[in-house]
Amino acid sequence: MQLLRAGLTLALGAGLGAAAESWWRQRADARATPGLLSRLPVLPVAAAAGLPAVPGAPAGGGPGELAKYGLPGVAQLKSRASYVLCYDPRTRGALWVVEQLRPEGLRGDGNRSSCDFHEDDSVHAYHRATNADYRGSGFDRGHLAAAANHRWSQKAMDDTFYLSNVAPQVPHLNQNAWNNLEKYSRSLTRTYQNVYVCTGPLFLPRTEADGKSYVKYQVIGKNHVAVPTHFFKVLILEAAGGQIELRSYVMPNAPVDEAIPLEHFLVPIESIERASGLLFVPNILARAGSLKAITAGSK
């Protein structure tokens, strides 16, 4: 656990709940077609809230006037056939990706051999990764929403190959321990009515020889794609009786012995919330009323 312990107290802060609810209502009103968004029990989203008027502000002034020429940036939400993603243009990758797993979605006509990694043209060219960034880097293009989770249609699987759904991942991790965690997530669809998965990168601090803590990470390619120090995966599990269970994992972006049980990588959800700036528990409790968090050693 030494690989995990040092960094899991980084507090980036997040005031996300009200903005998420506002965005949710706007999205529901704008699009009546049922989809993944309408079924999510939790939506940790760093969306921009509306700009309220300020009493006593001079005529022609106030927050609304400040946005006259637009705001330089707000959270970039992207809804795909198989997942919802919040994009971080600074790192050239996702803040988080949320997907829903059900048994019927794990089988179908989706064929990985027909897929290719491709740029996300919905992201400005200044802020997106390219395949050239990964070439010769020594890192895999590691899926956040796994391709094997979405065999139900070729389009759903194709969408997992956007580079916005990818992060630089150490090959040994990607192909072994992380792959085992993805397989385990899929296996839970045999036990639970719904399995919601939220996956994302972490950039955790380390204490160095001078006794000070620093957040340092490598970047690759001409677009400076950030290499996460760790990855998290949060599983929100709906049992048939309505109970909600939560399992939250963190793995270092480094070779991990796949013989180590996955339980070893369970962490308290609070550590991920503090480190990522995201909130899960308040939104889940607002919808479910109760929650059972599974941690290492718990039954």
Curated annotation (Swiss-Prot):
Modified residues (Phosphothreonine): T130
Species of provenance: Bos taurus (Bovine)
The protein's enzyme class: hydrolase
GO CC field: mitochondrial inner membrane; mitochondrion; nucleus
Catalytic residue positions: H143
Compartments, record wording: Mitochondrion
Protein name according to UniProt: Endonuclease G, mitochondrial
Cofactor: Mg(2+)
The EC number(s) this enzyme carries: 3.1.30.-
GO biological process, one term: negative regulation of TOR signaling
InterPro entries named among the record's database cross-references: DNA/RNA_endonuclease_AS (IPR018524), DNA/RNA_non-sp_Endonuclease_sf (IPR044929), Endo_G_ENPP1-like_dom (IPR001604), ENPP1-3/EXOG-like_nuc-like (IPR020821), His-Me_finger_sf (IPR044925), Non-specific_endonuclease (IPR040255)
Start and end residues of each stretch annotated as Essential for deoxyribonuclease activity: 288-298
Function: Endonuclease that preferentially catalyzes the cleavage of double-stranded 5-hydroxymethylcytosine (5hmC)-modified DNA. The 5hmC-modified nucleotide does not increase the binding affinity, but instead increases the efficiency of cutting and specifies the site of cleavage for the modified DNAs. Shows significantly higher affinity for four- stranded Holliday junction over duplex and single-stranded DNAs. Promotes conservative recombination when the DNA is 5hmC-modified.
Positions of Mg(2+) binding: N174
Residues carrying the site annotation Essential for catalytic activity: R112
Modification note: GSK3-beta-mediated dual phosphorylations at Thr-130 and Ser-290 is necessary for its interaction with YWHAG and the induction of autophagy.
